[in-house]
């Protein structure tokens, strides 16, 4: 996690989660293009490359169902706050065996703490009255699609 995030600086308006294990490939390119477009519109954005983050697997221990938060103190912890503070989240993943990447599945599993806080404890850990946007971008390994995105960007 970036040291600025630990210092309590303002959360980005848009969180971009790159779920690819491959550095500087299609998902990274798309994440950077999306970030540039949103910043041109005046939105603050931050890309999180989850394969560079320390995120433990959910063990289904039930801790979050008793407390409303996860027992692990890892790089997921600041993301929970950013999910609450942000205007939206964009998730980008390669298609692995007709699904999302393994580490992205871990991130999804770890959002169980948010679910449990609302539906088990009736004490939502995020402000449910706040409108947010969400987007998922599935990325296949076709190089001409990247070229098309570059052309559309002009």
Model-identified regions with their sequence ranges:
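N-terminal beta1-alpha1-beta2 submodule of the flavodoxin-like/Rossmannoid cofactor-binding fold
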Residues: 1-116, 121-124
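Short, glycine-/small-residue-rich phosphate/pyrophosphate-handling segment
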Residues: 118-154
């Amino acid at each position: 996690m970036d040291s600025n995030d630990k210092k309590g600086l303002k959360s980005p308006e848009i969180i971009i989660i790159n779920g690819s294990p491959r550095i500087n490939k299609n998902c990274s390119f798309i994440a950077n293009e999306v970030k540039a477009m949103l910043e041109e519109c005046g939105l603050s954005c931050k890309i999180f490359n989850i394969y560079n983050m320390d995120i433990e697997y959910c063990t289904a221990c039930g801790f979050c169902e008793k407390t409303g938060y996860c027992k692990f103190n890892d790089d997921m912890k600041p993301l929970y706050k950013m999910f609450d503070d942000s205007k939206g989240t964009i998730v980008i993943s390669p298609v692995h065996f007709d699904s999302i990447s393994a580490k992205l599945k871990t991130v999804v599993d770890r959002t169980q703490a948010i679910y449990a806080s609302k539906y088990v404890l009736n004490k939502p850990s995020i402000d449910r009255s706040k409108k947010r946007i969400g987007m998922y971008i599935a990325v296949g390994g076709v190089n001409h699609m990247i070229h098309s995105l570059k052309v559309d960007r002009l």
